[in-house]
Amino acid sequence: QTSPMERFIVNLLDSTFDDRSSRPLHSVAPYWLHQPELNECNIGNSLGEVINEKDKFAVRADVSHFHPKELSVSVRDRELVIEGHHEERTDPAGHGSIERHFIRKYVLPEEVQPDTIESHLSDKGVLTISANKTAIGTTASRNIPIRASPKEPEANQKSAINDAKQ
């Protein structure tokens, strides 16, 4: 399985070295491209996938390295905030410790209804946060009743009423 960056570099180098020499392509690739540590981190998916459709907004993120109690989802103004935090732990080999913390923020589109935001964590560790959207500028329509106001007195009646008050 190759990452998008690796495919880009391979395509770029293929077009540059179009003579198809016998020199292996990986020998000219950056050193970090084949390091297993980076592939294990799954960098591409950890950033999340945004789904912005006409009637729905959703975000999916791989948070499989975190327990549900180590995650939080909140909305601050028009910003969706996902946080995860591991407390410092000693690694199993006893050579050191590890602590992980991330904060990922997404600006919510104007048409997202904040009160419809829901989050679900799958058994595979994929966090999905979704919300309904409404069309911008549309409001619920309603009829406004026309009520009869009390009859106003005529001009000569107004002066008689004013004289009586004085």
UniProtKB/Swiss-Prot annotation:
Protein name: Small heat shock protein OV25-2
Keyword Amino-acid biosynthesis: no
Assigned protein family: Belongs to the small heat shock protein (HSP20) family.
Gene: OV25-2
Keywords, ordered alphabetically: Stress response
GO CC entries: cytoplasm; nucleus
Disordered, as annotated region: 140-166
UniProt domain sHSP: residue ranges: 38-149
Originating organism: Onchocerca volvulus
InterPro entries from the UniProt entry: A-crystallin/Hsp20_dom, Alpha-crystallin/sHSP_animal, HSP20-like_chaperone
A single BP term in Gene Ontology: response to heat
A Pfam family matched in the record: HSP20
A Gene Ontology molecular function term of the record: unfolded protein binding
